[in-house]
């Protein structure tokens, strides 16, 4: 099998303990909200759980802890006051905005996006998408589109997370930054 463009990012998440090696297959597969929360929680070291108001998440769901952690950390809200919709997919603009908010980024005024499909980016997302583009966290497709409403894939999330978290220093000694 030929290498996938996202393999280095997926490998990095495995090295960091964010994903298991068996979770890196099918990098083009759309990621669910629950899977996204699990990746973000592990990448950022979020562990503190809190109560959740969601009726569509039960204690025996594999993602219960991750939803409770994400909601408590404040980076993930429900799709309504009582639903988390953990099995729904996530769009590219949603994933970018969640990560940008998690990094305390602010909307970039002007909201001018250079993508040929920039008008398809939702109004609520434009400023944060612009900030993420300007910060080199996300780029569009080679055809100069962004695909705001496309499902975000496992490989795309891996690339976003690695760009947001950066490469940790894991060598002993003194480091000057």
Residue map of PLM features:
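Catalytic cores of secreted/periplasmic or lumenal enzymes
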Residues: 129
